[in-house]
Amino acid sequence: MTALNTYRRWLARVEDDALRAELSALDEVRDAAQIEDRFYRDLAFGTGGLRGVLGAGTNRMNVYVVRRATQGLAAYLKAAGLPLRCAIAYDSRIGSARFARETARVLAANGVTAYLYPRLEPTPALSWAVRYYGCGAGVCVTASHNPAAYNGYKVYGPDGCQITLETADAVSKHIGAADHFDGVRLCGFADALADGTICMIGEDCLEAFLDAVERRSVWDGDRSALRVVYTPLNGTGRECVTKILRRIGVTDVTLVPEQAWPDGSFPTCPYPNPEERAALEHGLALARETRADLLLGTDPDCDRMGAAVPDGGDYRLLTGNEMGVLLLDYLCRRRSENGTMPARPVAVTTIVSTDMADAVAAHYGVELRRTLTGFKFIGEQIGELERAGEAERYLFGFEESYGYLSGPHVRDKDAVNAALLCCEMAAWYRAQGMTLAQAMDALYEKFGYYRNELQSVVLPGEDGMERMSAILTALRAAPPHTLAGERVTRVRDYLGGLDSLPASDVLELRTAHVKVIVRPSGTEPKLKLYYSAHARTMAEAAALCAAARRDMSARLGE
């Protein structure tokens, strides 16, 4: 069916008033390009579930697309013989609460018991609920840190991890077999509540989650003097983060007022990503005013955390790699000192995260495992340890994109856990007369200076994906002989699978002091290049990264 015919069918069948008005406003001639974009395909379902712009159309996030995806998920659970139970959470985004309720209605109509949080909650609380109720799956309605125009639908497996590629393919096939209008079962929300096929998640589940997070503490010293500014970026983090901080005695917490309450329009930060300085500008201003020891920011679904700390009269943003290394060192040091370090401890990070983690782990005798990008792979490593009866060996996991987890209580990155650890670590260093900036600099002095940079090369146009594939093919066929003036001594191609990792379209180049990893984004025509350099000073490391970037840009024709 053509995009135009699909548009006409939707115009005739859609009952939702807002979506119908949106479709009715389109003119088949004047808006032909927009109709094509809305209806030329179904919104893609992958390991991250669904994610797209809100609006009417098969290539948009709306109630009909969500219902159809849920019909496919219910069919998959039955076909796979998994428990017919599914936990549901949602964030502060436009439409999230409704999408969550519609997900519950479709599941219940298909004989799958839906456990629905009664209010917005962080994504890690969804991972927890999946495990708490023994569910076959979980759904979190969120688009993470995308702009306000987006929403999404993340699917989790029975282990509390985001689903694998194989599972995503299987669910996608079931989704494809369901018609948006005639192929979806739906029941009344109130009726399903009455008969128990929709269950509202109680406070016992959330309190148990917070108990599990609190048990990740490794220092019981006084934290009351720590001054914290916190912004949930108008997302889900406020309740859980402030509760967990109060539990451990961090009471001097000032919320950024413009960003304290849930608001899916994100009026003060169009791109609510705590990795970006722009999203934290309001928090930085308040931190300067209150002379805070620490600024924390969590993204709308509260699975990523950014931080800024006093340094030289202003505030310094810590990168995801720096926070990961600081927390790894802190956990190793404290657990070694208090006698809780497990035998044969394991830390996990990704192939694109800093090599400094290897140096820190080796210093403490910790096995460091590396996975492909995506926290689900870190969660899978925890699962492997758990199946071997060795879950206690897991110490910490992080990825350079601001995701952290210090326990096996959930299987996704957890900014509630990260906020607890970061505040505790800051208080511990404060008691020794040090800031986190000074602590990071001390680690650089001890282990050497590591510089990490990310370059994204956008390849627009219909042939963008093909051009990206051609670039990687050419790099594999003839990799550069030198980078940053150093000889390339190692080329690792993950396409055939390396180090027991699944096959992945990733190429790694190494010299004596430089590492470059090249991979496609997977969801858009964008090539990602991760640069890492190790040197005696940060200036030298930065120069090496810059030189490697120039070399690769020249190779790519940038």
State the predicted function of each range.
Residues 39-59, 143-144, 232-244, 300, ...:
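Conserved phosphate/anionic-ligand binding catalytic regions in large, soluble enzymes, centered on
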Residues 87-150, 247-307:
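N-terminal small/polar loop signature for handling phosphorylated ligands or for N-terminal nucleophile
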Residues 288, 292-294, 314, 334-519, ...:
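Phosphate-binding and adjacent anionic-ligand microenvironments
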Residues 97-102, 127-131, 149-155, 176, ...:
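Short acidic, glycine/serine/threonine-rich loops at helix termini
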